[in-house]
Amino acid sequence: TLDSNGKGPWAGNEFNHIEDTIIQQIFDFISLFKKYIVWVNTVELPKKSPISLIDEIKIDHFLSFNYTPTFLKLYSSASALSQKNICYVHGRLDEDSNAPIVMGVGSDFYNADLNEYFLKTFKFYQRYKYCTDLNFLNWFKEIRVEYSWAPSGQADEEFNVYIYGHSLDPTDKDILLPFFETENANIVVYYFDENSRFSLEKNLLKILG
């Protein structure tokens, strides 16, 4: 609402200060979160047993949205993968809490006219700025080559995508959608209970549109 002089409740400098404060608090939280993750990695926890259903899967590639190698440590089928078949798309934290990570808002929420000032809080910009691992994009090229040489478009083995421990939140739509759109892909999503299944289904509908 403007007053009789055509001015709003905040002057331009005041509004800019509020924006700067919000952004600084967001990145202060991310900094504390990274320290917490590094600390958690040093804590000795009771040994966990792998889930047999997951452990029996033949894993050729591993895409992680987490920041730690917990899955690789727990599941032997993934621990032997070569580095080119492992991708920490949001960054990886081991002992260095200063390593950059992606933690922000999804690209679907970005409006260049409204959000330009907050660009640095969006995941797609953070991936660009921090040069996080996007090796998974090369996997699609390998898949297309494999299927192009297979008789009648059928490869020797099925192209299976297993999703475990991800909420399918639309903030990661730009990474998840290519998997769902890949021809001949068989998508398997693991869930904990019926409530989590319903939540996953809702998010999946948002991703697929």
Tell where the protein language model's regions lie, with residue ranges:
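A conditional alpha-helix N-cap/helix-loop micro-motif detector
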Residues: V43-E44, S64, K141-I143, L168-D169
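SIR2/sirtuin-family catalytic core signature
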Residues: S148-G209
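Short, conserved, surface-exposed binding loops centered on an aromatic residue
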Residues: S79-A80, W139-D156
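Catalytic lobes of large eukaryotic enzymes
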Residues: L114-E142, F192-K206
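Extended, H/D-rich, highly charged conserved domains that either
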Residues: T1-L134
